[in-house]
A protein has these predicted regions:
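Short, solvent-exposed secondary-structure junction/capping segments
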Residues: 333-345
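Bacterial N-terminal signal peptides
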Residues: 15-25
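Exported/periplasmic cell-wall-interacting domains
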Residues: 95, 215-318
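Short beta-strand edge/turn micro-motifs at domain boundaries
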Residues: 399-428
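Surface-exposed, charged secondary-structure patches
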Residues: 355-406
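Alpha-helical protein-protein interaction scaffolds
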Residues: 32-129
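Gly/Pro-biased beta-strand-loop elements
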Residues: 138-250, 256, 260
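Short, aromatic-enriched amphipathic alpha-helices that serve as compact interaction elements
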Residues: 309-328, 335
């Protein structure tokens, strides 16, 4: 009997704990919506002042629908109907759906019809409203700080475009003269119809990684469905090719000329902005000097995480350079990853090549300048990856040259040193 009572008491405690957790979660969510509603109504927060009247109304109506107040949503949307906005029409349809469900519940005896209405899925169309609301809430509770992944922007970096697929947001930054970063924009962007990292041609996914804009398409070179202008990126890059990812034609482009709204996942793998915003942002694109970072849930902070990461990368690059000029070939080769490739050479071929070359030298001098360091926000099979690009000056007892170089450094965890996974010389 005591054992049975103990078990019953234990079950009761678990049920009570679950109820408390559910109650506390619902209170937190209710408080969150109340904060958003208040901010949108009083208009004092910077996140609200930067909104157009139309966007503000759409956000207010979206919140009203989230808290099951369709009548309030319809009142708000009535003031936005003049703009002929398809997103307003979709929100209005959702409000009428909620109203109909409420009416059937009050009438009673219509469970089957109520279930049919409840199962009607408007999420594809309303995805843009949800994404915009999430972005607004992020800005309302803004986490201060720079993006961790832009470790160091060299003097030849014009801008960095960051595409956060999880948030459907595009952040754009410009380097400042004092080595900092200035945020140019934070806005809604459309990505591929299929969730996840691109692997194959035609899979509908947007690739994860670090890229550059390399071309500009417009006029007769661009179909009208892509908007007024498009900027292809250099996908697939060396890291993609190393992992046998294929496909091509990943662009930043606009909307079809007769479209003003698009759901969050609605392209064949590209990034898409509304045409007016695309034209505004086009002035910040400088081919081969505008970097592109694609990932999910970027981290922004003022903590020492970024400085620690930067220090570790700079330390290991300098150790590589130092061992190179020492002509201690084995120490120099210890900085290369076991999966290393450069062109057609794997690590074994690279070792044979470098041992042969260094055997005929009495001195080597190497310098790195104009360096850019970008941390890839995505985890690769080799672990964490950083892309380093720099001008390399090389002089030895029998050879000298200068070239632009890009290396991909990898480490399995934070306790390990960075190793060179890929090394390539770039065309000037």
């Amino acid at each position: 009997m005591k054992l049975q009572n103990s078990r019953l008491s234990h079950r009761f405690n678990i049920i009570w704990l679950l109820l408390c957790l559910l109650l506390s979660s619902s209170i937190t969510i209710a408080g969150e919506w109340e904060q958003v509603t208040t901010a949108l109504q009083d208009g004092k927060a910077n996140a609200v002042r930067n909104l157009s009247n139309q966007e503000r109304t759409i956000l207010q109506a979206t919140v009203a629908l989230k808290i099951d107040k369709p009548d309030q949503a319809l009142m708000l949307l009535a003031s936005a109907k003049h703009a002929k906005d398809p997103l307003v029409d979709l929100l209005e349809a959702e409000a009428h759906r909620q109203q109909a469900i409420h009416a059937m519940k009050q009438a009673g005896g219509m469970e089957r019809q109520e279930k049919l209405l409840a199962s009607a899925d408007l999420n594809d169309g309303l995805g843009e409203a949800d994404a915009r609301l999430r972005a607004f809430m992020d800005r309302l509770n803004k986490q201060e700080g720079d993006p961790v992944d832009i470790l160091m922007a060299g003097p030849n970096v014009a801008s960095v475009f960051m595409f956060d697929k999880a948030r459907n947001r595009m952040f754009v930054y410009e380097p400042t003269r004092n080595g900092g970063l200035k945020q140019i924009t934070d806005e809604y962007v459309v990505t591929g119809t299929v969730i996840g990292d691109k692997q194959r041609r035609g899979d509908g996914r947007t690739p994860h990684g670090v890229y550059r804009f390399v071309k500009k398409l417009q006029g007769k070179n661009l179909e009208s469905r892509y908007g007024p202008v498009a900027f292809p990126i250099d996908y697939p890059n060396e890291l993609d090719a190393f992992h046998k990812k294929d496909g091509s034609g990943i662009w930043l482009h606009g909307y079809p000329l007769d479209v003003s709204r698009r759901p969050p996942q609605d392209t064949r793998g590209c990034f898409s902005l509304s045409n007016d915003r695309l034209l505004t942002m086009a002035r910040y694109v400088k081919l081969r000097h505008s970097w592109v970072i694609v990932g999910e849930n970027f981290v922004f902070d003022h903590s020492n995480r970024k400085s620690k990461l930067l220090s570790s990368v700079k330390r290991d690059i300098e150790a590589w350079r130092r061992d190179w000029v020492s002509l201690d070939t084995e120490a120099y080769l210890s900085h290369y990853h076991r999966k290393f490739r450069s062109g057609k050479r794997d690590l074994a071929a690279w070792k044979r090549y470098k041992r042969r070359v260094n055997a005929n030298k009495s001195f080597v001098k190497v310098g790195f300048t104009n360096m850019t360091l970008i941390h890839d926000p995505n985890t690769w099979p080799e672990g964490e990856v950083v892309v380093a690009e720099f001008d390399q000056s090389y002089r030895s007892s029998n050879y000298a040259d200068k070239e632009r170089k890009r290396v991909y450094l990898a480490r399995a965890n934070a306790d390990q040193s960075w190793k060179i996974l890929l090394e390539e010389s770039l065309k000037q």
